[in-house]
Every structure is written in C-alpha cells, then in structure tokens.
Amino acid sequence: MKTRVLLTVVAGILLASPAFAQSDACDRACLESTVDRFLDAFVKHDPSMAPLTRTVRFTENGQRLTVGDGSWRSMIAKGTYRLFVTDPRAGQVAFIGTLREENQQNKDGAPVLIALRLRVERRQISEIELFVVRNENAAKNCEKLGTPHPLFLEAVPPAERMSRADLVKTANMYFTGMQQNDGKGVYPFTDDCNRFENGGQSTNVPPKPGETRADPKTATMYSSQWGCTEQFASGLLHFVSRIRDRRYVAVDE
C-alpha cells in the first residue's frame, strides 16, 4: 500500500467545533475558494474583498502584521502553480503556489513562491499565516512543473486511507530521518519516491554524459542521482542538524 503524504509548512491539528451550525461548515470546495478570494484581495491590495473576521490574525514570515501591510502592498498578480492541502475537519487549508510581485526591472512582476495557511470559521478567515520566498528560480521551477504530481490530486480509496495520527506520524518521520541523519533510521519511502526542493528534482537525477553514478555505499557526499531511500540510508544528510518548530496544520484525508 502506498503512503501518500504531502510535506508542507503546516500548525497543530485543530478539530472543528461541533457547535458550528451545519450551514456554517466549510467543505473542501468552500475552503479552496476561500483561498482564491483571499488571493484576489491580496493582489488587489484590498482586504475588504476577502471574507475576514473582525479579529483576523495575520503573520508574514513569522511576524505579526496589520492586515493590509507587508506583501499586501507589493503583490500584483497570481501565478500558475497551485497546490492545496485541504482539511475541512480542522477548518484549515494550506496552499503552496506562486504570485507576482512588483519589480522595477519587469513590468509583469517578479515571480515569488508562497506558503499560505488559512483558518476559516463560519466561512470567514480568522487566521492568515503567510511565508513568502523571494527566490525567482524556485518560483520559476515550480511553474515549470505545471501542476502538482497526480498522486497529490488523487483520492485514496477508503480502504487504503491512513488515520490522521498516522499521516502526521509518517510526515514527521521524514524530518526525523533527515535531522542528524545517520542512515540507521526508519525511512518510509516507496521505491519510486522522488523529492523536489524549491521546484527542482533532488533525487533520481540521471548522470551527465560521461559521468558515473555515485555509489551510496562508498560516497562521501550525498548525490541527487540517488533515490529517496538511498539518500537517507547513506547517512550523508547529517549536515541538517536540527529541524525545529514542526507543525502540521492541515491533514488532507
């Protein structure tokens, strides 16, 4: 059975309040459309266009800001890469995608990569957590991917679904396996696993012409030519000394 776990920047799992009326519930379509409504308001520099609570909390790159400040002033258009992690049970949705930011050298704006979390209560946004990565190559690489891998968009048959707790546990094993990597951990990868970092493939990269594939048993540095398990089992990711503040804000069941 394949485990399909999406690793994003994402906060402790919050259960939706049973006190909410059924009419106030926000399903998958509702949550994802709320992201679009937020982004439309964001690139128009107009918070009044978004369904915000009066006490909405907004952070950007870890800093508490007033709604309308920060990147609200500089983003000018939505990009083309879109990946949702939607959790109706928690009333939260995470989004990884691209935007365009005003740029004097480019009238169409410079591409940026964002990670976004919204908490939605009674169909209004009560929390906005935004990370902006101003790395044009990363944003361009994501857009070159076109759409997310089909497995991320495929509904897992009910009989094959993991529990919320096991999904989080498996995702956390990725970070635990990378932190102070020694090659002796448990690495739950499928044989055809691939890793992508900032939109670029970092596993199973074919050797260049005339180049010999590095041997994970004898190499002294890890290689992007190896598969996921080979990289982790090599013990050569030990330069990642700590992965802290691990948070799982959305579990897409």
Ranges and model annotations:
Residues 8-17:
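Bacterial N-terminal signal peptides
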Residues 1-7:
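Bacterial N-terminal signal peptides that target proteins for export
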Residues 21-253:
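C-terminal and inter-domain tail/linker signature
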